């Protein structure tokens, strides 16, 4: 297992420039043919904030703040925006080998890089959304304290976990379409059971403990710690330790599945 870890880390380090270039190419492909191009990176969060504002202000007539911060910052910015990233990773990120078969069939191209550059391309979009949210919050007079400094660290943990997720499950999805289709059905349950639309702090302790093993819940809560709750995410050991445990499990699964199946994937595809 340690030999596989050394191999994967070595491949990603040796090919780091190619990984960055592939991530940028994948990002450009997303908006290729659009007249506004990269402006869509910021148009999407702007539209969602506008829609939520109209729905809450005139539809539900709800304007209650959360910890002194606008509800718009709590739900769409610190809840739905992280979900955009994770939703793509749950569905497409767990089946990247079928998404890029031309790279899989290249003899000298390491398969571990595919998960890395795909996750990186989505993380760039997420970073743009967070930057947009921060600018809008500051322009509207919302005070953001020193706890925002931990946001890059949260994004680093997001990157590590979802790369491991992709490496662990993509070989299985490449071999079995049934497994791939099963994973694609998980998007809706994850969305509704991860505290994106509601605050899980009111749950019974046992339910919160179970939810803490859900990586989607940890990401959403950690982003809200940065923007809303003004606390360091690593001081909440009841949620941080379970996340680290799940991260370790997926790293082990990723190394195991990669070692056993990476030679078979090109033949299957």
Regions found by a protein language model. Name each.
Residues 1-269:
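Hydrophobic transmembrane alpha-helices and immediately adjacent juxtamembrane helices
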């Amino acid at each position: 297992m340690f030999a596989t870890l050394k191999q994967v880390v070595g491949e990603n380090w040796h090919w780091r420039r190619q990984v960055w270039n592939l991530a940028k190419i994948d990002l450009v492909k997303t908006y290729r043919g659009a007249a506004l191009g990269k402006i869509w990176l910021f148009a999407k969060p702007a539209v969602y904030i506008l829609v939520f504002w109209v729905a809450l202000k005139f539809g539900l007539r709800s304007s209650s703040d959360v910890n002194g911060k606008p509800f718009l910052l709590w739900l769409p910015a610190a809840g739905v925006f992280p979900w955009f990233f994770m939703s793509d990773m749950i569905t497409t990120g767990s089946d990247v080998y079928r998404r890029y078969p031309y790279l899989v069939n290249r003899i000298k191209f390491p398969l571990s890089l595919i998960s890395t550059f795909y996750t990186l391309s989505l993380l760039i979009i997420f970073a743009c959304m967070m930057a947009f949210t921060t600018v809008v919050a500051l322009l509207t007079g919302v005070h953001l304290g020193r706890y925002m400094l931990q946001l890059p660290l949260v994004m680093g943990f997001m990157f590590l976990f979802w790369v491991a997720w992709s490496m662990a499950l993509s070989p299985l999805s490449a071999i079995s379409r049934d497994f791939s289709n099963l994973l694609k059905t998980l998007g809706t349950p994850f969305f509704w059971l991860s505290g994106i639309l509601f605050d899980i702090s009111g749950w019974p302790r046992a339910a919160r403990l179970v939810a803490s093993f859900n990586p989607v819940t940890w990401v959403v809560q950690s982003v809200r710690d940065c923007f809303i709750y003004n606390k360091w995410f690593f001081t909440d050991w009841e949620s941080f330790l379970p996340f680290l445990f799940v991260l370790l499990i997926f790293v082990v699964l990723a190394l195991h599945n990669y070692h056993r199946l990476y030679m078979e994937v090109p033949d299957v595809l």
